UniProtKB/Swiss-Prot annotation:
Gene Ontology molecular-function annotations: ATP binding; metal ion binding; nucleoside diphosphate kinase activity
The protein's name: Nucleoside diphosphate kinase
NCBIfam families: PRK00668.1
Protein's gene: ndk
Catalysis: reaction(s): a 2'-deoxyribonucleoside 5'-diphosphate + ATP = a 2'-deoxyribonucleoside 5'-triphosphate + ADP; a ribonucleoside 5'-diphosphate + ATP = a ribonucleoside 5'-triphosphate + ADP
Amino acid sequence: MEKTLSIIKPDAVKKGVIGKILDRFESNGLRIAAMKKVQLSKEQAENFYAVHKERPFFKDLVEFMISGPVVVSVLEGEGAVLKNRDLMGATNPKEAKAGTIRADFAESIDANAVHGSDSLENAKIEIEFFFKPNEIY
C-alpha cells in the first residue's frame, strides 16, 4: 500500500484545525499509519528542506517551520501521494480549489497549512526523516 508524508504546519496547528485536517484524510480513504506532534529545531528544518537551500524563500521557510509545533503523519492508501496532494490543493491558497485544505485553512503562500510529499521517492525519504520503521503501523 502506498504511503506519503503529511505535515500540518505551525499556522494550522496554532489555529486549532488539526482534527479537521486529519478528518479530510480519513474521510477520503487515507489511513493514518503514524503520527506525532513535534517542535522542529532550526537544524531539522534546514535538513528537511535542504532541496530548497538555494531558493530565495529558504530562510523564511525554515523560520516559519520552527515558529511552533507541527504534526507529522504517515498517510497510507491507494495512490496516497496524489490523493494527499489533491486534498491539499495548490501551494498558493488563493489558487487552491474550494474545499481543499489550503483553500479552507491556509493564510498565504508561506503559511499554507500543510506539506505533502510530491513523489513516491520523496515520500520514502521524508517518512524516514521523521519515523523509525517500528513507529509505523
